[in-house]
Amino acid sequence: MKVRGRLLLAFAAATAAPIAAQEPVVAVPDPEALFVSADPALHANKQLALHFMRELLQCNHWERAPEWLSERYLQHNPNGRSGRDGIMAFFTRTRPRTDNCATLTSPVVAVLADGDLVTVVMPREYDHPARAGEKYTSTWFYLWRVVDGKLDEHWAPATIAAP
């Protein structure tokens, strides 16, 4: 009986799915469809996040930032400075401008709005640390607080990159 039990256990272990297996994180086909709500206040907040993602991050139209960002724009990302002027200067200096901003091309998994908070969840691809040449996906998010009709505070799971 002991031998049979060991054989069954060995078979189960050999045929079980790897512990580190995962389902890939996949974006929706039409990300802009997620930035809507039947609730007018939540819809307005989601639209602010859409403008940030599309006009500012994707197309680098930072001259329009005052339409959507508060002057104080608090940054809880260790790689960014607080203040609208600082973020405008950084992105204007470091990224090229794209003229066609008709649709959001960034992959998005979900957009959640609750009260004054809006979260955009995105897939992110990483190099697998144990298997050279392989990639895996996980999630990334942006979270904003809306104050007086503008994005006022921002969080992201960013870490400080090594020099």
Where on the chain are the PLM-derived regions?
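Short, cysteine-centered beta-strand-loop-beta hairpins and adjacent loop/turn segments enriched
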Residues: 96-101, 126-136
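A short hydrophobic beta-strand element
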Residues: 114-124
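Bacterial N-terminal signal peptides that target proteins for export
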Residues: 1-8
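Short, surface-exposed coil-to-beta transition loops
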Residues: 104-106, 135-141
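Short beta-strand edge/turn micro-motifs at domain boundaries
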Residues: 23, 139-163
